[in-house]
């Protein structure tokens, strides 16, 4: 249906006019329109939903002369369909019936009561438990970008001023927003096209003055200087648009969003998008969450702890004091064994971070309050354990945990032990919490005694032995008599329902009692809902302190998890130095050692002011890439406060980690593998410093031999001489092994292999010096390349090596490289013989025969 039809409402039925008016207010969303027990979708919404949800597309009569495409879903199954839609990046407006159909003249009154978008989820059923769900906004300035993210499910609000396209790309990969807001004139769509939940917003929503006003209203302040963000103009424009969007979609106060933090790149080790991808921090190269650094490190016992750990992994710190604080906490938890008891207690806390967000939005359910109550009950035990700790950071966290005896006592009095899922039907408020509620409940529940007495009385009065007094939700209270005795009922009995073998009646007395009970039930439920709403008002004043409790508990979970990993995997505490360099003894790759079927071979690395670059050579499949990645991962782990898989690690200042490892075509941008490789290389050469860790793997593979070797040589020379970056430079160009003779601070190391006949055994051990050969043909044979191809390759290798050494191969040199020489008669004869079948005499005769064939 086009926009002209939407505006011409008079030709539609009253119900469709109501629908189209609401749809016009939410043009970019699917509108779930409540009709009885179903949510219906019409026109284009129905077609889209039918395709995305695999539901039937039908038609509902005509309106305006045309059939109306329609699709519907049952209201009781809506959460499952919503989850699928938000995963696809769709937003949904939910329109409910708020009027009474019995009294309505025309269409029942309806209202959009809830808006669900991928980036503003707070409902437990729709969220990924162990992943942040971020709403982001980006604003492009003349120079640089403003970027803001908000986790509505926790209240965490962060902004960043990003100087370049590369910095924005890295932030998008780090945060992986579920929904991204961008302005109408955003000029770099190639950066954001891959994000499913993109939302284009009008330019006025990014107006600076409008945005500042929006933020000041939210935080209740006169200016933003107290947050240290007053000069972050571009990111404040992004933040203001984001805040406007959240208010529009949530349609309620947002008290849990009470601060905003500026992310400064200088506070953490900078990881560009390629590095995050190549190191497989939280997502593997295949897109899985298995076999990643996070999958090995994460044994946290709470979902909020898991989310914090992933944020730490993507944001390794540079401040040594903060890192040492974490290390000392982990060390004490490990040495005392306290981490085991602490983890058992933390596990009982649940996901209070998200519970508090739902509390702030007043969308919390009864079981959320019960979980919060249980968490507050565990808190004194956790604090008591931490009282015995000496580590300064553990003491600070213990203070941040806080005390909430009054809130705990309130929730214990107010909420039943095992409340129902919803407040809708009551049964949530505990008996004894409110005397008036108890009285109404007693009246509505105490009818059991009354009905039993009435049943006995009526049996005596009528002499009907089969008489029963009962109740059902459809017909209310009734007196039931078997059909055989129905002739005995008094004249005052009024027939209410006829069944196969019984008759049901109502009497004036029973009718009066029914009205009284139903009235008391309604009043009890109304009062219970009122008391429920008051609970929010009683808890919310402590929201900030409760959020601090959740934050401290999350960090305790991560630190106890680090102690658990160190104990289980034999990790050691790394030392931090103010002198540039990385020294690792017996280092191991944290992921490969966990998934490998064979024992992992530990390896050392030494980078210092006098040993800035290692040229890494060795056989393909020998472990060069694994070795380089393990150095980067150990360095990163040390900077998040974790212990590391090494006997010893001494690590100096690191400002960035770069990786140029592997590449594939970027088809979306029309870039070849070689172009991707060179773009990543250019980024490293422009941005690396003397404190950067650089991993360069096989530069120059995507072009001709001499072009590739020249580029690799020049890049290595630039890194070593101009930048002085700490570099591991793996290459298959053996000419580069001459660099140590020409440049100070450059050294050769290699991964060894042992060759036996036509087979090869990889030793995976790093040794000083250059490798002697690459063993490419042996690796090809292991990969299953046909034997005749390997044989031809060996011949061609000899031919090329002889040519390089100036050997006159005359006829053979005339052969094109794509040709394989025919085997000689002697070779053919030898291939046809099994030596085990020859007698001594036959063997002697064969020798003479072969001599003649040469």
Swiss-Prot record:
GO terms for molecular function: ATP binding; ATP-dependent DNA damage sensor activity; damaged DNA binding; mismatched DNA binding. ATP binds at residues 618-625. Signal peptide: none annotated. Keywords: ATP-binding, DNA damage, DNA repair, DNA-binding, Nucleotide-binding. SMART domains: MUTSac, MUTSd. It comes from the Bacteria. One of its GO terms (biological process) is mismatch repair. PROSITE patterns: DNA_MISMATCH_REPAIR_2. GO terms for cellular component: cytosol. HAMAP family: MutS. Belongs to the DNA mismatch repair MutS family. This protein is involved in the repair of mismatches in DNA. It is possible that it carries out the mismatch recognition step. This protein has a weak ATPase activity. This is DNA mismatch repair protein MutS.
């Amino acid at each position: 249906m086009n926009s002209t039809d939407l505006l011409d409402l008079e030709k539609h039925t009253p119900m469709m006019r109501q629908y189209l008016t609401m749809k016009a207010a939410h043009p970019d969303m699917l509108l779930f329109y409540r009709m009885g027990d179903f949510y219906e979708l019409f026109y284009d919404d129905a077609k889209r939903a039918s395709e995305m949800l695999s539901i039937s597309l039908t038609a509902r009569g005509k309106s305006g002369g045309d059939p109306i495409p329609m699709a519907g879903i049952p209201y009781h199954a809506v959460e499952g369909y919503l989850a699928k839609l938000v995963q696809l990046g769709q937003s949904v407006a939910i329109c409910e019936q708020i009027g009474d159909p019995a009294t309505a003249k025309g269409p029942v009154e309806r209202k959009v009561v809830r808006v669900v978008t991928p980036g503003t989820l707070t409902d437990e059923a729709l969220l990924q438990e162990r992943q942040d769900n971020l709403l982001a906004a980006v604003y492009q300035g003349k120079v640089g970008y403003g970027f803001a993210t908000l986790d509505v499910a926790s209240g965490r609000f962060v902004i960043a001023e990003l100087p370049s396209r590369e910095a924005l790309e890295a932030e998008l990969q780090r945060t992986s927003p579920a929904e991204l807001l961008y302005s109408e004139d955003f000029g770099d769509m190639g950066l954001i096209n891959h994000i499913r939940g993109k939302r284009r917003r009008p330019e006025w929503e990014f107006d600076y003055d409008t945005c500042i006003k929006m933020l000041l209203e939210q935080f209740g302040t006169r200016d933003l200087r107290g947050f240290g963000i007053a000069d972050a103009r571009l990111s404040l424009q992004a933040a203001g648009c984001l805040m406007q969007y959240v208010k529009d979609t949530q349609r309620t106060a947002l008290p849990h969003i009470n601060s905003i933090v500026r992310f400064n790149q200088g506070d953490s080790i900078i990881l560009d998008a390629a590095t995050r991808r190549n190191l497989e921090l939280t997502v593997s190269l295949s897109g899985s969450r298995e076999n990643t650094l996070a999958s090995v490190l994460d044994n946290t016992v709470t979902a909020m702890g898991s989310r914090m750990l992933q944020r730490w992994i993507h944001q390794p710190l540079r401040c040594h004091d903060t890192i040492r604080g974490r290390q000392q906490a982990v060390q004490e938890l490990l040495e005392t064994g306290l981490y085991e008891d602490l983890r058992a207690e933390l596990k009982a806390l649940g996901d209070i971070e998200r519970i508090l967000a739902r509390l702030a939005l007043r969308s919390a359910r009864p079981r959320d309050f019960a979980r919060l109550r249980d968490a507050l009950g565990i808190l004194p035990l956790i604090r008591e354990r931490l009282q015995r700790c000496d580590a300064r950071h553990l003491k600070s966290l213990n203070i941040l945990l806080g005390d909430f005896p009054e809130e705990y006592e309130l929730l214990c009095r107010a909420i039943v032990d095992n409340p129902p899922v919803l407040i809708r039907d009551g049964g949530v408020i505990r008996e004894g919490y409110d005397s008036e509620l108890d009285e109404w409940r007693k009246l509505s529940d105490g009818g059991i005694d009354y009905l039993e007495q009435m049943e006995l009385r009526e049996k005596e009065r009528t002499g009907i032995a089969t008489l029963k007094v009962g109740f059902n939700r459809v017909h209310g209270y009734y007196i039931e008599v078997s059909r055989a005795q129905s002739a005995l009922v008094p004249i005052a009995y009024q027939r209410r329902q006829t069944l196969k073998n019984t008759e049901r009646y109502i009497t004036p007395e029973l009718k009066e009692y029914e009205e009284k009970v139903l009235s008391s039930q309604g009043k009890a439920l109304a009062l219970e809902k009122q008391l429920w709403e008051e609970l929010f008002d009683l808890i919310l004043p402590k929201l900030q302190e409760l959020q601090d409790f959740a934050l401290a508990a999350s960090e305790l979970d991560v630190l106890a998890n680090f102690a658990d990993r160190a104990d289980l995997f034999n990790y050691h505490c790394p030392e931090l130095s103010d002198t540039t360099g990385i020294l690792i003894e017996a280092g191991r790759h944290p992921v490969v050692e966990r998934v490998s079927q064979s024992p992992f071979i530990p390896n050392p690395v030494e980078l210092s002011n006098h040993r800035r670059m290692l040229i890494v050579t060795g056989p393909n499949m020998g472990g060069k890439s694994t070795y380089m990645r393990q150095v980067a991962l150990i360095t990163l782990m040390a900077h998040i406060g974790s212990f590391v898989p090494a006997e010893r690690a001494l690590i100096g200042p690191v400002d960035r980690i770069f990786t140029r490892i592997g590449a594939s075509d970027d088809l979306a941008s029309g870039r070849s593998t070689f172009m991707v490789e060179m773009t990543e290389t250019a980024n490293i050469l422009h941005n690396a410093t003397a404190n950067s860790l650089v991993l360069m793997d096989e530069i120059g593979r995507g072009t001709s031999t001499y072009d590739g070797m020249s580029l690799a040589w020049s890049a290595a020379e630039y890194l070593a001489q101009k930048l002085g970056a700490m570099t591991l430079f793996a290459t298959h160009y053996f000419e580069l092994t001459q660099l140590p003779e020409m440049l100070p601070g450059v050294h050769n190391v290699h991964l060894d292999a042992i060759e036996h006949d036509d087979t090869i055994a990889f030793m995976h051990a790093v040794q000083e010096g250059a490798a002697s050969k690459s063993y490419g043909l042996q690796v090809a044979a292991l990969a299953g390349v046909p034997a005749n191809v390997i044989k031809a390759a060996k011949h061609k290798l000899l031919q090329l090596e002889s040519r390089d050494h100036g050997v006159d191969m005359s006829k053979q040199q005339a052969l094109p490289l794509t040709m394989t020489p025919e085997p000689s008669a002697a070779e053919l004869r030898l291939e046809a013989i099994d030596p085990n079948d020859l007698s001594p005499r036959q063997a002697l005769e064969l020798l003479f025969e072969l001599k003649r064939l040469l």
